[in-house]
Each structure stands twice: as structure tokens, then as C-alpha cells.
């Protein structure tokens, strides 16, 4: 039985992960037990989860919300931690042996490193951790003998396709698929008056707001491009991206003999979540089966980098390397937050991200502080450029 610490339990990935645990337990299997839960501030849902799954400990990032939760669950035998220290404390619990990090943003970096240093099996859905601190994360994982299990559908697909590979030198390239988001096929002139509500209408996937906006700008695929470089130790030139509107083929690998292997399934995040939690075993899933006869055709297109400029910015950032991916990620997080508040336009996101990718200096990443400082400077630039104060 794997004993799970779930960071980000009230978010999109977190709630789906708990659906997976329910399904596995309903099937009579006891492969996963929820040992710890963490959330940012949604203590109403977190309390419900605590009463259902009975974890040993929980953490709330927002300090005031943590105090309220302590009062709400004083009748239960559960320890309530708070802040960044609380998130990290959960990953070090002796009773925990696997951590699923599904928090959104740079806040996920320190808990990931702490979990790896504690030699916990690590399932990562927090792509910003690898984008900003990929060299640190992979170095720490290697030093502690930990294999990182990807939860993003595309990276899970690549991970599954690689099972049974004889030698890494047999691999020619990996091919990530992108849905294209809600604005596929549109040009820049058609995207001048996009509102948050428009960008939040994803055609295939049920995701949180930030990730859905990133999908609409193709920033999500740029982040996944960087993530793939670190997860699979690939050069940027050996990673391709194709737009696949149906979201049935989740990603592919090509071998030296030009044979191609793909992972297919209906677009449901519970498949990659479950595989990460139960790896290397597989269990019955709550997800419906894929019936290929229902699909008359599957389509593939080259991404439009001229219109969706964030994607190219990410590729340029990882080629320059160092702290620049952290800066680009920080700029995007700040810009998306402003867009969701309708303080800037949808197209402003790409302009801000590209400016950081093309003009910011880069430096070697030697510590968490290097990553956090690059992130801070990029966020400060975005806020200053948009007339906002850092708060």
C-alpha cells in the first residue's frame, strides 16, 4: 500500500486524484491510502476531505485559513500545519512514501525538493517546479535515487511509451501533442478583445483557471516543452510539438528506426493521475474506455507560433537556459493573474512573456535562491510595466 501526501487537494488535479483513490478502494483494492492533504485556502472543501479520508496531517498555505481550519476540525485527530513550512512538513512525514504535488505555481518548488531529499517517491503535476528549477530537481532526484513520475497527460504518455525501452540511445525524439486551446485557427487580429470567460472555455479538458488560460496562449505547451527536456533528459531539438484537436493521442515517441509509439485514451486526467499513484501496477479506472470506431479521423497540425507567441518564448528560454525559464514562468504567472482580473489584455500576456525571454539576462542555477530571484524580478517587471504595485 502506498501512503499518499497530496499537495493541492482542493484543486482540479487534487480532487480528481481523490476520485481515483475512491475508485481504487471501491474495487476492493487498498493500493493507496491518503496520509496527508494540503490546500491553499479552500478550507471548506478541505474539511470535507479530512472527514472522508481521515489523514494524519494537513497543511493550509494561507495562515488565517489554517487557524480557522484548526477550530473546525478540533473534534478530529489530525494535525494542522500552515504556510510553506507546513507544505514541506507533510512531505517529510515518516508515514508518507509518495507525494503528489499538484499545487499551482512556484510555491511547489520547495516542497518538491524537500520530498526528494526525504527520499519520497515523487509524482509531479506542478509543471512550474520543473520549468523553473529543473536542474535542481533532477539533480536532487538523482542524488537520492528517486524516479520522478509525471502526471501531466503528455509526459505521462511519454513515460508510458518509454516502458520497455532497451537503451536511451535508441530514442530519436519525443512528440508532445497540444489541443490548440479554444482559439485554434484564429489569427492575431481576431484575438484583440478576448475576455477571461472566452479563454476559460477549453474544448476538451477540465482544468483549473490558470492552466486553462495557459492552454489558450499555448504557454502551457511551452512549459511542457521545458518540462519534457528535464524529465526525459532530451535536447530541445529532439522535442517536437503537434496540435491534435481531438486530444486522443496524448503524446508519442519516435525510435531511431523511425517507428513511432503513441499512448491513446479519452481526455481525462484521472488516467495519468492513477498511473502515477499506482505505478508500476494498473487497476480498474473510473474513466470510460476509448472506442476508436467513434472517431472517423484524428488530425495533426503544426503549432502557429506567430499568433501564439508564448510557445516560442519558452523554446528560446530553455535554449538559453540557466535562470531564464524561471523568469519566463514568473512573468507568465503574473501576467495571467492580471488578465484574469481584466487588468491587461489576452495579447499582453504574450508580449510580456516574450520581452522577458528575449531581454532578461540569464545566470547558472546553483540554488533555490537563484530560481526565486529570477522569478521575483520577472514578476516585478510585469507589475511595473502594467502599472501595478507588488503586493
Predicted regions and their residues:
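Catalytic, metal-anchored helix/loop core of enzyme active sites in primary metabolism
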Residues: 1-391
Amino acid at each position: 500500500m502506498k501512503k499518499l501526501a497530496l499537495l493541492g487537494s482542493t484543486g482540479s488535479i487534487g480532487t480528481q486524484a481523490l476520485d481515483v483513490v475512491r475508485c481504487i478502494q471501491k474495487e476492493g483494492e487498498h493500493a493507496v491510502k491518503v496520509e496527508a492533504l494540503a490546500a491553499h485556502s479552500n478550507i471548506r472543501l478541505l474539511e470535507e476531505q479530512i472527514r472522508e479520508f481521515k489523514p494524519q496531517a494537513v497543511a493550509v498555505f494561507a495562515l488565517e485559513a489554517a487557524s480557522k481550519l484548526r477550530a473546525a476540525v478540533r473534534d478530529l485527530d489530525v494535525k494542522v500545519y500552515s504556510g510553506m513550512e507546513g507544505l514541506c512538513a507533510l512531505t517529510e512525514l515518516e508515514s508518507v512514501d509518495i507525494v503528489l504535488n499538484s499545487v499551482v505555481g512556484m510555491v511547489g518548488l520547495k516542497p518538491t525538493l524537500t520530498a526528494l531529499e526525504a527520499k519520497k517517491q515523487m509524482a509531479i503535476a506542478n509543471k512550474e517546479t520543473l520549468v523553473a528549477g529543473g536542474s535542481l530537481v533532477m539533480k536532487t532526484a538523482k542524488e537520492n535515487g528517486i524516479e520522478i513520475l509525471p502526471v501531466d497527460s503528455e509526459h505521462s504518455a511519454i513515460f508510458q511509451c518509454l516502458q520497455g525501452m532497451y537503451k536511451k540511445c535508441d530514442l530519436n525524439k519525443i512528440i508532445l501533442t497540444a489541443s490548440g486551446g479554444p482559439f485554434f485557427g484564429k489569427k492575431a487580429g481576431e484575438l484583440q478583445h478576448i475576455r477571461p470567460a472566452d479563454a476559460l472555455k477549453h474544448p476538451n479538458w477540465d482544468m483549473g483557471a490558470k492552466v486553462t488560460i495557459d492552454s489558450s496562449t499555448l504557454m502551457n505547451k511551452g512549459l511542457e516543452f521545458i518540462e519534457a527536456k528535464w524529465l526525459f533528459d532530451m535536447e530541445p531539438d529532439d522535442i517536437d510539438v503537434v496540435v491534435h484537436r481531438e486530444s486522443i493521442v496524448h503524446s508519442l515517441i519516435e525510435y531511431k528506426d523511425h517507428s513511432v509509439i503513441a499512448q491513446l485514451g479519452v481526455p481525462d486526467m484521472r488516467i495519468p493521475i492513477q498511473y502515477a499513484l499506482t505505478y508500476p501496477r494498473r487497476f480498474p479506472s473510473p474513466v470510460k474506455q476509448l472506442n476508436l470506431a467513434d472517431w472517423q479521423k484524428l488530425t495533426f497540425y503544426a503549432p502557429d507560433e506567430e499568433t501564439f507567441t508564448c510557445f516560442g518564448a519558452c523554446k528560446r528560454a530553455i535554449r538559453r537556459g540557466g535562470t531564464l525559464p524561471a523568469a519566463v514562468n514568473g512573468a507568465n504567472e503574473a501576467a495571467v493573474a492580471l488578465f484574469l482580473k481584466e487588468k491587461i489584455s489576452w495579447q499582453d500576456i504574450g508580449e510580456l512573456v516574450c520581452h522577458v525571454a528575449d531581454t532578461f539576462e540569464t545566470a547558472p542555477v546553483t540554488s533555490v535562491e537563484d530560481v526565486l530571484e529570477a522569478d521575483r524580478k520577472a514578476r516585478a517587471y510585469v507589475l511595473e510595466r502594467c502599472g501595478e504595485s507588488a503586493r
